[in-house]
């Protein structure tokens, strides 16, 4: 079967492997200590962010990462189906099937999902960035966003390769239709624009319809404004 990816899967795997070697996924994850009447509790930084309904997608997208993101989305919906969920995206892309699993979950749950690009959102990362709730998709000013067509490897007999090529074309068409629906672009325009890597800065992504706003700074609390 074809191994279809929507982005730098090899690069994403290298990033993840490097993180493991450096201990980033384990011992180097920052811990947050909170003190209450019951004593002290320690949270890893990502668990603490989850309490604020913030999900951080900071790696390549594979089945394991997708499973974690989907589980967090469903959990946060069960906690409060009315409050927004925030996904911060800094991803080089990855597996199409994994990314579509995240996408479908984002559309399925009741809360609005706000997406924010921090650093880079490439290929499936850009796809998920654009898939947030309309009006609630944003980027920091110096982030980079990239769209392109899916890639895949095929092997076996000629008939098998033909079947796999047809499947890749179906997936490509599906992704183009979804991206067009979220950006307001024509499907043919999306196909032409994603024929090769198309990199955008935050302003260009705003004009393309991938995001709705650019965050420069957080607004100051009302008390600070008054002083």
From Swiss-Prot:
Listed Pfam families: CLP_protease
Provide the GO biological process annotations: protein quality control for misfolded or incompletely synthesized proteins
* Keyword Magnesium listed: no
Superkingdom, taxonomy of origin? Bacteria
Name the Gene3D superfamilies on file.
2-enoyl-CoA Hydratase, Chain A, domain 1
One GO term describing the cellular component = cytoplasm
Catalyzed reactions per annotation: Hydrolysis of proteins to small peptides in the presence of ATP and magnesium. alpha-casein is the usual test substrate. In the absence of ATP, only oligopeptides shorter than five residues are hydrolyzed (such as succinyl-Leu-Tyr-|-NHMec, and Leu-Tyr-Leu-|-Tyr-Trp, in which cleavage of the -Tyr-|-Leu- and -Tyr-|-Trp bonds also occurs)
Q: What is its EC number?
A: 3.4.21.92
**Location in or out of the cell:** Cytoplasm
Q: Where is the active site?
A: 123 (nucleophile), 148
Q: What is its main location?
A: cytoplasm
Metal-binding is among the record's keywords: no
Ordered alphabetically, the record's keywords are: Cytoplasm, Hydrolase, Protease, Serine protease
What GO terms are given for molecular function?
ATP-dependent peptidase activity; ATPase binding; serine-type endopeptidase activity
- Free-text function comment from the UniProt entry: Cleaves peptides in various proteins in a process that requires ATP hydrolysis. Has a chymotrypsin-like activity. Plays a major role in the degradation of misfolded proteins.
User: According to its UniProt record, which protein family does this protein belong to?
Assistant: Belongs to the peptidase S14 family.
Q: How does it assemble?
A: Fourteen ClpP subunits assemble into 2 heptameric rings which stack back to back to give a disk-like structure with a central cavity, resembling the structure of eukaryotic proteasomes.
NCBIfam families from the UniProt entry:
clpP, PRK00277.1, PRK12553.1
Q: What is this protein called?
A: ATP-dependent Clp protease proteolytic subunit
Q: Which organism is it from?
A: Chlorobium phaeobacteroides (strain DSM 266 / SMG 266 / 2430)
């Amino acid at each position: 079967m074809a191994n279809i990816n929507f982005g730098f899967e090899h690069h994403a795997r290298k990033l993840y492997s490097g993180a493991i070697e450096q201990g980033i996924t384990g011992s180097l994850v920052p811990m947050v200590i909170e003190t209450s009447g019951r004593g002290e509790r320690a949270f890893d930084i990502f668990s603490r962010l989850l309490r604020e309904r913030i999900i951080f997608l900071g790696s390549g997208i594979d089945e394991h990462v997708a499973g974690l993101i989907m589980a967090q989305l469903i959990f946060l919906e069960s906690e409060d189906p009315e409050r927004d969920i925030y996904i911060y995206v800094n991803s080089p892309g990855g597996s199409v099937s994994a990314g579509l699993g995240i996408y479908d979950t984002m559309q399925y749950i009741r809360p609005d999902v706000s997406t924010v690009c921090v650093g880079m959102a490439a290929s499936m990362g850009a796809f998920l960035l654009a898939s947030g709730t309309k009006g609630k998709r944003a980027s920091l000013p110096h982030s980079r966003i990239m769209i392109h067509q899916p890639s895949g490897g095929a092997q076996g007999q000629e008939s098998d390769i033909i079947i796999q090529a047809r499947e890749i074309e179906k997936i490509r068409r599906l992704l183009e239709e979804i991206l067009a629906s979220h950006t307001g672009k024509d499907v043919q325009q999306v196909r032409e624009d994603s024929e090769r890597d198309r990199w955008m800065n935050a302003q260009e992504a705003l004009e393309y319809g991938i995001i709705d706003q650019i965050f420069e700074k957080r607004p100051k609390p009302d008390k600070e404004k008054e002083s």
